[in-house]
Curated annotation (Swiss-Prot):
The chain crosses the membrane at residues 25-45, 65-85, 109-129, 134-154, 179-199, 203-223, 248-268, 302-322, 344-364, 371-391, 392-412, 425-445, 459-479, 494-514. Its main location: membrane. It is a multi-pass membrane protein. The gene is yabM. It is found in: Cell membrane. It comes from the Bacteria. Belongs to the polysaccharide synthase family. Keywords: Cell membrane, Membrane, Transmembrane, Transmembrane helix. GO terms for cellular component: plasma membrane. It comes from Bacillus subtilis (strain 168). This is Uncharacterized membrane protein YabM.
Amino acid sequence: MDDSIGVKRHWIWQGAFVLILAGVITKILSAVYRVPFQNIVGDVGFYIYQQVYPFLGIAVMLSTSGFPVIISKLMNDYSEKNHHTILKISALFLSLIGILLFLCLYLGAVPIALFMGDSHLAVLIQVAAYAFLLFPFVALLRGGFQGRHEMLPSALSQMTEQFLRVAVLLGLSFWLVKKGASLYTAGAAAASGSLAGSLVALIILGFFWFKTKRDNQTDRQNENVITTKELTKKLLLYSVTICVSSLLLLFIQLVDALNLYALLSGGEASEEAKCLKGIYDRGQPLLQLGSVFAVSIATSLVPYISMAVKNKELKIMKEKITSSLKLCLVLGTGASAGLICILKPVNIMLFQNGEGTGALQVFSCSILFASLAVTAAAVLQGAGYTVFPAIAVGAGVAVKWVLNTLLVPRYGIEGASLATAASFAAVAGLNLYQLRQKEWLDKLRGVLIPIIGSALLMSAVLLAYTRLWTFLFPATGRGAAVIESLSAVAIGGAVFIYCMMRLGIFTDEELNSVPFGSKLSKFMRRREQNGG
């Protein structure tokens, strides 16, 4: 019995690693491609694409970390004999949702665009609507594979989908801008990249599915039939809870898409407001890059924690939860503090100028809060508490909408950045409060002061370094900004890691579970033995 549990745990962690790797690669690509895209189309073109990106992103997330998680959870909750019924009912359920969302977006494109304050966006919204016709099939197949702990097809399809999406987006936008096409046409072409990526992902998943189908036949005559009513209830519940929680970052972006331009422009068409919204949207790739590891870890936590709860391994579950939250806190704090200190050269390096640096520094605080919010939500979901994280997301979206309305008319994009940080902080605070009520945060108290101290020391070093650089090299071109930014990242990262190692924030076991952690541990032990 113990051996079978051990083997199962091994397969779960091996599969989780595959999905973590795929998630890291796809999220890095999702953040990085926006830099050359902004360089191609400019701030106004970036604004146009970002207005419809939340719709595209929602379709991608539903087919990647929303419904696949739900389907795999259902397959793990019920015996293998019920898997065929689960997949059949899920297929019908997802198809209905996909058609409904498509019709709402496609038929409502003009009213939505008018609500946003830019009627030219209607065509782009209609293009984005087609993504919801493809997502049900992609989500179903990914969920089926993940429910059988076969992570390779899901991971491979994710990476291929993202590579193709980026290639089509950049290629078409570059070609159209070079030809002199309008930025709205380039934006619509860029949005079509998501459709191409989803179609190829579906082909890859279909190939693996039909290839393995014969090896996974079950005896349906002895099938323990689950009622349609029972499964539909669970699908509806999980759709509102798990899916809503996974869409936190996109919902916050959706609020900005719906009301930020209108608030900046005062309800009138304004090129300046479009440019400001595009500058503000520079913060999105920074947020994604800064939180990519925490978000990827959070996604992989759900099936493991569910298995630990199912096997009543509560001590192991609590240890893994503590380690994951600690890692999230460290990565989020370091990324937020470091980026705030070097934001000006990073802004010039990535986006060609330093416009909006102050607003983006405020926005950078969101990295820590978003990382904590997503990771804490995943922990709660894995432990079976799926409703509360969804409520927290709803509260965060409400905070964002209200603060945008109050702050943007007075403070512009700085107010929008503050509203974003506050909304993520609200979600993180609610989820962490719930974890505290479960007594799962006790071991984190002792590491807060060392982490804050490490971040403050790193910030002091970075601020001194950037001032020294400005004094020695007054040039403000993009080439100088690249050298300053990359060298500052190396220096700040080294200082932060060294402080954490010296203060013993992580145990040897925790270090051995992260990339290069064991080498860092050995390096620090050698220094201590040599009197360093």
